[in-house]
Amino acid sequence: DAAAFPLPDGAAQYTADAELVAYASPLMHSPGPVFTVRLPEMRLPQPLRHVIVLEGVQDPGNVGTVIRTANALGMDAVVLTGACADLYSPKTVRAAMGALFRQPVLTCATDELLQLLHARGLKLYGAALTDAAQDLRRVPLSPAAVAIGSEGRGLSAQLLAQCDGQIIIPMQPGAESLNAAVAAAVVMWEIARTGM
């Protein structure tokens, strides 16, 4: 019953069939209303010194975990580019554990990302398993942005070519690569340890 859910002035109310409500809500049994809101425009902080960039990270749990870790370790912003998981999917929101509402997060195209970093005077380093990559402990990551790639493919060749340098997390010989959230956490810890 629509009268059971009073709305603020100016809010429109519609009745949807059960199939549409099931599509719009991840809950098995909806408590009633489903709503949409306009998200506020994200403004990045000034100064911008420590940025984590995720490119094509498709697992929403990893995206949420990176946002939560970035908030815990004092990163200025997280930027999502490429085909990253939906920032507001239920799994991303759960994994972020509330940090999504405290941590500046921006979603943008790669060219916009590069313009933003250039305008703020930040170098961009790409985490990569290449011969050109330097031990992250030997690279000054403050101020800087560090890009972490997708779980299966890493950073795209296009973004890697735009990086000012490449870094690698030193690991034991024969160890498998880390997943995106763990790699980002190690990088953020190093930034927090050395540059804040």
Language-model regions: role of each:
Residues D1-P60:
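Arg/Lys-rich RNA-binding interfaces used to dock onto structured RNA substrates
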Residues A18-A24, D111-Q115, A132-A133, G174-A175:
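A short acidic, often aromatic-flanked loop/helix-cap motif at beta-alpha or helix-coil junctions
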Residues T36, P40-A132:
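RNA substrate-binding interface of SAM-dependent RNA methyltransferases
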